[in-house]
Every structure is written in structure tokens, then in C-alpha cells.
């Protein structure tokens, strides 16, 4: 059996599964030991840096879309995930006074855009898989 097939079939899913399983105790540990209130340092840099990264991913997604690149599937999905992370932290770190605004902007802006981008990524990924599968069948048929 080809080593690439072994890695694809067994190793990659095992690594992701193991990481997910080992992360569970870590999350429980954090729930027990982290304070409910913490004064963050470099707050501005963290938020500005994250949003700059989000702009880069949005721009890359747009450029890859204009280029009709197969990499659009990955960029669109990743950008959608970043938008969901942005909403989560906007809401969780907002003061009680600002929380309604964070929820409204998340529900009306970030979440719909994230779902659209992730849907685009999934659709393109499925189509690429279908085309690759068809090409494999065509090659096998020609042999």
C-alpha cells in the first residue's frame, strides 16, 4: 500500500481525534482555575491584530474568488471560522452596556457572512472532490 494512502486513511484522522480528546481535560481544567475577571494587557494590539488578520483573510478570499482558484474553498471556510471567533470574543468580552450591540452586529453581520463563506467553501470542496473522483474513474476506465 502507498504510504500516502496510509497517512491519509489512518494518521491524519488519528491526530485530529487525539487532539480533540486530549483537549477535553484541558478545557475542564481551565474552567476550574481561570478567574471570571482578568485585566488584559495589550488589549488594543490583540484586537487590532486579530482584525488585521481578518481583513487579510477576507481580501485573500476575494482575490482567490476573482482568480477562480481552487484554494477559495479553504480561504472561504477559514475566513468564516475567523468571523465566528470574532463574534464569540466580541460578545464574551463586551461590557454589559456594549453586549447588546455586539450581539446585534454578530447576528446581523458576522454570523450570516460566516455561514455564507463556510457554505461556499464546502460547496467548492465537494465539487473539487466530485471532479477528482470522476477523473480517477475516467483514468481507470482508460487503462
Per-segment meaning from a language model:
Residues 1-20:
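Cytosolic juxtamembrane helix and N-cap/initiation of the first transmembrane helix
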Residues 6-12, 33-43:
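Short juxtamembrane and helix-loop transition motifs at transmembrane-helix boundaries
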Residues 21, 45-63, 78-85:
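Core segments of alpha-helical transmembrane spans in multipass integral membrane proteins
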Residues 28-37, 88-97:
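Juxtamembrane "helix-exit" motif on the non-cytosolic side of transmembrane helices
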Residues 39-48, 97-109:
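Non-cytosolic membrane-interface motifs at loop->transmembrane helix junctions
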Residues 51, 73-91, 110-116:
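Hydrophobic alpha-helical membrane segments
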Amino acid at each position: 500500500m502507498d504510504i500516502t494512502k496510509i497517512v491519509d486513511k489512518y494518521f491524519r484522522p488519528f491526530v485530529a481525534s487525539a487532539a480533540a480528546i486530549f483537549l477535553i481535560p484541558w478545557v475542564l481544567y481551565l474552567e476550574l482555575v481561570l478567574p471570571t475577571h482578568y485585566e488584559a494587557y495589550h488589549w488594543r494590539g490583540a484586537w487590532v491584530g486579530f482584525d488585521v488578520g481578518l481583513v487579510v483573510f477576507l481580501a485573500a478570499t476575494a482575490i482567490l474568488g476573482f482568480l477562480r482558484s481552487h484554494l477559495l474553498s479553504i480561504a472561504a471556510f477559514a475566513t468564516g471560522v475567523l468571523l465566528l471567533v470574532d463574534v464569540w470574543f466580541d460578545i464574551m468580552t463586551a461590557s454589559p452596556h456594549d453586549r447588546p450591540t455586539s450581539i446585534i452586529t454578530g447576528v446581523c453581520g458576522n454570523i450570516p457572512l460566516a455561514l455564507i463563506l463556510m457554505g461556499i467553501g464546502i460547496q467548492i470542496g465537494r465539487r473539487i472532490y466530485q471532479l477528482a473522483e470522476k477523473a480517477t474513474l475516467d483514468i481507470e476506465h482508460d487503462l
